[in-house]
Regions:
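Bacterial N-terminal signal peptides
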Residues: 13-22
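Catalytic cysteine-centered active-site loop
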Residues: 171-179, 212-222
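Bacterial N-terminal signal peptides that target proteins for export
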Residues: 2-12
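Intrinsically disordered, low-complexity N-terminal segments that are enriched in acidic
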Residues: 25-95, 143, 148
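Cysteine-centered nucleophilic/redox motifs
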Residues: 161, 189-217, 233
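Active-site rim recognition segments
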Residues: 218-294
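Catalytic cores of extracellular degradative/oxidative enzymes
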Residues: 90-103, 182, 223
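Secondary-structure boundary elements
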Residues: 100-190, 198, 265-267, 276-294
Length: 294
């Protein structure tokens, strides 16, 4: 008999793949990025510090540890009985594994289809609003966003894209479709995945390497803390991966901790398999603990 955790993960992945395979067109339905059960141990109280200790129940602790090793500000100290013990900073950043990112993060893909007319219109609107930050090279008699160069501070450009997409999507929804960038550009609606694919499309159209990261975000406000399945971006700017999160733009005053599960590297027709990995590697439960608990 399968362990209950295994049964739950298999059922979720089966549902995910079935929905993706059965839904035609450019907008596929996926299961809800759920709220993940999170508790505070008796020795922990709010407000949380900039670095916190977590006990995270996961399906495959060794694999999840290898994924988390791609970011600094997250330290895995061990695991036991499917519970990963780690510390995480609210200033977590990706580790640069090369002087420049893989060309795939500039590609026009099935998911981040920035060469579609609807996305080009969004990019043009961005340039009209923030054109001073971008120089577009001339290719023949036309202007190519694909060969654009950054004129201003790289971090400033990332922040401008983040703010622009946050305001461009006028109908935030929780129906949890996984729509491609061109669909989001037309509908101007969606949840965190839609914000992420459109942000990635705008960045790539401006020759900024961009990728989508899927994982969990722990959000604290004045009186509570919760963990939610989430998607965000990382842009390659000034030799570093910088986190961009248009979906959480309005929540800037809140304290946030990002716990990645998967980088969406497969953006082709088989992208659903990548999403299934994200589901499999997602936390089942999270407990914020103290040194006394360990």
């Amino acid at each position: 008999m399968k362990h209950p955790l295994v049964r739950n993960k298999v059922a979720t992945i089966t549902l995910l793949l079935g929905l993706l395979a059965a839904t035609p067109g450019y907008s596929q339905s996926t299961p809800k990025f759920a709220v993940i059960p999170l508790t505070l141990s008796d020795n922990v109280s709010l407000p949380l510090s900039n670095e916190i200790l977590l006990d995270v129940s996961v399906y495959d602790p060794d694999f999840v540890s290898s994924v988390l090793g791609q970011w600094s500000g997250i330290e895995v100290v061990g695991h036991r009985d499917g519970v990963l013990k780690l510390s995480i900073s609210d200033n977590m950043t990706a580790v640069a594994d090369a002087q420049s990112p893989h060309p795939q993060y500039l590609a026009n893909t099935f998911v981040i289809d920035y060469k579609e007319a609807s996305v080009k219109e969004v990019v043009s609107a961005f340039l009209a609003e923030h054109g001073k930050g971008v120089i577009a090279k001339k290719v023949g008699s036309s202007t190519s966003h694909e060969e654009s160069k950054l004129e201003s501070n790289p971090g400033e450009i990332g922040a401008k894209i983040e703010a622009f997409v946050a305001n461009y999507i006028t109908e935030p929804s929780y129906i949890h479709n996984f729509s491609f960038a061109s669909t989001v550009a037309k509908s101007r609606s969606g949840d965190c995945t839609e914000y992420a694919v459109l942000s990635g499309a705008v960045a790539r159209a401006l020759a900024i390497p961009a990728r989508v990261v899927i994982g969990t975000i722990i959000v604290e406000d004045d009186s509570s803390v919760e963990a939610i399945g989430h998607a965000w971006n990382e842009f390659w700017l000034d030799g570093h991966w910088r986190r961009i999160d248009a979906a959480m733009y309005s929540a800037e005053p809140l304290k946030k901790y990002y716990l990645p599960s998967h980088i969406l590297n497969n953006e082709g027709p088989g992208y659903a398999l990548g999403l299934s990995k994200a589901v499999l590697n997602a936390p089942e439960r999270i407990t914020v603990v103290s040194e006394k608990d360990r």
